[in-house]
Amino acid sequence: MKTQDRSGSGPSQRMLRVGELVRHALADALQRGDHLDPALAGTIITVPEVRMSPDLKIATCFVMPLGGKDVNTVIKLLAANQKLLRTEVARRVELKSVPSLRFLRDTSFDEGARIDALLRRPDVARDLDTETDAEAGSETTKEED
């Protein structure tokens, strides 16, 4: 059977679907926290994204504790509890093989805050207002015709 070269293309539908299933299972396991390390028990952890490798053997889990405090400590604790979390994912998701879990800091909130700060800068706000006024003027001209 011939394999396709997928370099340059995004994740497959299967990778996206399995990633979402793993994300839900992991978030549920972290929310319940039944068998977790006591240091993690009181921490609320969000899992906004899980990216699967093409062979579905590795799940890269992007996590962020609520409030963004002690991120590195939380990631180290999650990595230390990886075997237990993997078992919890296996109980909740029916897969041929359970992926290995890797934990990384989620930077999407930081990126969103950075973009928001850029849009609030006076020079950018001025440019946006100028574009809005120009668009409104062109619509008025079209209506008069």
Curated annotation (Swiss-Prot):
Superkingdom of this entry's organism? Answer: Bacteria
Q: State whether keyword Cytoplasm applies.
A: yes
A GO BP entry: maturation of SSU-rRNA
Extent of Acidic residues compositional bias: 130-145
Q: Where is this region: Disordered?
A: 126-145
CC annotations in GO: cytosol
Assembly mode: Monomer. Binds 30S ribosomal subunits, but not 50S ribosomal subunits or 70S ribosomes.
Q: What does this protein do?
A: One of several proteins that assist in the late maturation steps of the functional core of the 30S ribosomal subunit. Associates with free 30S ribosomal subunits (but not with 30S subunits that are part of 70S ribosomes or polysomes). Required for efficient processing of 16S rRNA. May interact with the 5'-terminal helix region of 16S rRNA.
State the family it belongs to: Belongs to the RbfA family.
Q: What is this protein called?
A: Ribosome-binding factor A
